[in-house]
Amino acid sequence: MAGKTLYDKLWDDHVVTQRDDGSCLLYIDRHLLHEVTSPQAFEGLQLAGRQPWRLSANVATPDHNVPTSKKERDQGIAGIEDDTSRIQVQTLDDNCKAFNIVEFGINDIRQGIVHVVGPEQGLTLPGMTVVCGDSHTATHGAFGCLAHGIGTSEVEHVLATQCLVQKKSKNMLVRVDGVLGKGVTPKDVVLAIIGKIGTAGGTGYAIEFGGQVFRDMSIEGRMTVCNMAIEAGARVGMVAVDDKTIEYVKGRSYAPKGEQWEQAVAYWNTLHSDDDAVFDAVVELNGAEIEPQVSWGTSPEMVIPVSKAVPTLEQAKDDVQRNDWTRAYQYMGLNAGQALADIQLDRVFIGSCTNSRIEDIRAAAEVVKGRKVAPSIKQAMIVPGSGLVKQQAEKEGLDKIFLEAGFEWREPGCSMCLAMNADKLQPGEHCASTSNRNFEGRQGNGGRTHLVSPAMAAAAAIAGHFVDVRSF
């Protein structure tokens, strides 16, 4: 009998019962909540007269709608100028108090983007099933977790029962061996993977990321990669547990202590695919060949190395891709064969659940130090992923580096990743963004998003256009 994959092990450890149609009832260990996908779920509980099944499994924080300007944040919820945003944040606060759920509120130093806060607090632990009403919940798979996003009705179901009905995915291994070159980051790795397999390449699969590149990668880097598993078409992305994983978790607020810690570590050390495990699909890349990446179009798969030009229609593989590229040229205001350096940038955004952790901010600061934002850039902003990330960056003096260069230093939140708060692009503006999606209108109506790493975004802010950070 063949060995088990990491996904198989996590799945089997959480099956409550298997149903006649092949689906399973899975137990959920951790449920993270935010203000956008939870109101209807809480309302459903109230109408049915139910209470959460296991209070301690649930933790909430507002992130999508919170303003990132200090002026608004200093006034708390009452200072949120947008009515819809204020109501959503207030409703989360009210619901958490009514149901006695732990919330890191808008004025709590622990507040931040839910996928930054969970690991930071030790709420995310190896071997857990982790869900949240947010598609980028795969982030937590970096800890050897089975983590995925859920819809609002499922949020209610988890609150009420601590279980979910799920169908098992197939197994895919994405192996990246070799050593990354100078200036090549985890963001470049995951963009290169998506560029290779496409945004539908992982559909129906749980992706395990393996190989030397991921063994060498930091935990924060692994979070960046797992975060974008959904952009590769997979609902789940994960990396096996190793000593780095355990060291990262150790001593965090919600991590086990004492004898429970020793028991947990013994289990966590089993969370890797067996040597004889069989995957349904295997994709391989050579890490040494990956360059800094830049997305040029309106899908994360429309991505190229910084050394390349916008592709021409002759390079398209079929009529569908030709049609997609033609529409992307028009929306993005680009020409086939255009050099990336010729794209005039308007704004730069460094933040989001993909790239707003302390390592990301350090990487950007290293590029920015002693330089100035180009006069042609209308706005360059740094948005830390949590209050604690912001605090650590300020302790290291990174905020001063950015402020002296002409960047804005903001309060934590999802910010310009999505057009659900005050931080938006204007129609026609090009933005170098460290976020995860570049769909039409994602950062604002008519906004044009280019996905890059923090280092590449920082270099673009200084140059006013895309440059190869390796020679910057």
Swiss-Prot record:
Pfam families: Aconitase. Its cofactor is [4Fe-4S] cluster. Keywords: 4Fe-4S, Amino-acid biosynthesis, Branched-chain amino acid biosynthesis, Iron, Iron-sulfur, Leucine biosynthesis, Lyase, Metal-binding. Belongs to the aconitase/IPM isomerase family. LeuC type 1 subfamily. It is an enzyme of class 4 (lyase). Heterodimer of LeuC and LeuD. Binds 1 [4Fe-4S] cluster per subunit. Its EC number is 4.2.1.33. Transmembrane segments: none annotated. It catalyses: (2R,3S)-3-isopropylmalate = (2S)-2-isopropylmalate. PANTHER family: 3-ISOPROPYLMALATE DEHYDRATASE, HOMOACONITASE, MITOCHONDRIAL-RELATED. Catalyzes the isomerization between 2-isopropylmalate and 3-isopropylmalate, via the formation of 2-isopropylmaleate. NCBIfam families: leuC, PRK05478.1, PRK12466.1. This is 3-isopropylmalate dehydratase large subunit. One of its GO terms (molecular function) is metal ion binding. [4Fe-4S] cluster binds at C353, C414, C417. Pathway: Amino-acid biosynthesis; L-leucine biosynthesis; L-leucine from 3-methyl-2-oxobutanoate: step 2/4.
